[in-house]
A protein has these predicted regions:
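Acidic, polar-rich low-complexity tracts and alpha-helical solenoid repeat scaffolds
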Residues: 1-86
């Protein structure tokens, strides 16, 4: 449980520190290890945001679309839909 939270927050911290590439990788490692975590939708959303910050909009779009498909009722999916409209 602690490792799960630590891995998630490490990815968030990288994003907050503008280390976007590290954020994408760390959050993917978190998702791969804890695919059923309640934080997966948030992790995918932050990956998309990190990719946008890296000017990798096409990749970000794929992450947002995946989020909307896999977690359509999540708050993050609603935000992802807004990001796709921009």
């Amino acid at each position: 449980w602690y490792e799960e939270r630590a891995m998630y927050y490490m990815g968030i911290m990288y994003n907050d520190n503008k280390e976007y590439g590290k954020s994408v990788v760390a959050l993917q490692e978190f998702i791969d290890k804890y695919p059923n975590s309640k934080n997966v939708p948030s992790a995918i959303y932050v990956q998309g945001e990190s990719l946008l910050a890296l000017d990798r909009a096409d990749e970000a779009k794929l992450f947002f679309e995946d989020l909307i498909t896999r977690f359509p009722k999540s708050n993050e999916a609603k935000e992802a839909k807004k990001r796709l409209k921009k």
